[in-house]
Amino acid sequence: TDAKPTVCIIFYRSYLMAADLEPIDQLFSDFKKRDIKCISIFVNSLKIKSTAKWIESMLSKISPIAILNATAFSAKSRETGKSPLDHVGVPVFQIILSTSKKESWRRNPIGLNSSDLAMHVAIPEVDGRINGGIVSFKSEQAIDPALQFPISKHKVEKTLSKKIINKVEKWHVLRSKKNEEKRIAIVLSSYPGRDFQLALSLIHISEPTRPTP
């Protein structure tokens, strides 16, 4: 048997049909350099029942240490409230193939545009996804002589791709540790207000986190 740890990347079939796989290929290459095996699965949608069931079956066979999800929005079923990505109980990282160009991202004070924030950050967080970060931006190619228009494809950002690999590796190391070896920090917000209201609404939140004797 192959003793190498395995990660699974899930992405849209449309990327394959459009030969727009540069960010996926880059992740494969980066994982290989870290001696991590990589398997990819392409889908039309994670919400199709037959697809979701097949995904669960495949993930059980693959037994990945982590899943990288490049599909957008929520993957939870309306009927069950469950996502096929949660079937094997490993961290699921939401990776972002941005719909905007790098220049737009740099100029935007909040980085991603509103569509990307909704599709790849806010809604996936409701599913319990871990934000993996951006792996690529849209980039127009030269005008295709046959089609007579510039084809827009995803251009990988290698520095950001490596950050995703680092994050996956660190989560794997963390999961391998015993609970008593872990140190957890809980960061609570304290919105502006009067001094006597400082942290008032959070006063009981810390109680359940205290160790029991």
Question: What are the functions of these language-model segments?
Answer:
Residues 25-39, 206:
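Short helix-loop-beta junction
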Residues 63-67:
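Proline-aspartate-enriched helix->loop->beta-strand connector
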Residues 15-18, 46-49, 74-77, 100-104, ...:
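Flexible loop/turn segments at secondary-structure boundaries
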Residues 1-6, 84-86, 92-94, 99-185, ...:
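Flexible inter-domain linker/hinge segments
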Residues 39-42, 47, 55-62, 76-96:
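Internal alpha/beta domain cores that form substrate/cofactor-binding pockets in large enzymes
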Residues 203-213:
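Single conserved hydrophobic/aromatic residue that forms the stacking wall/gate
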Residues 17, 33, 37-59, 177-185:
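Metallocofactor- and cofactor-centric catalytic cores in central/energy metabolism, strongly enriched
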Residues 1-25, 32-33, 192-194:
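A short, flexible N-terminal coil/short beta segment enriched in small residues
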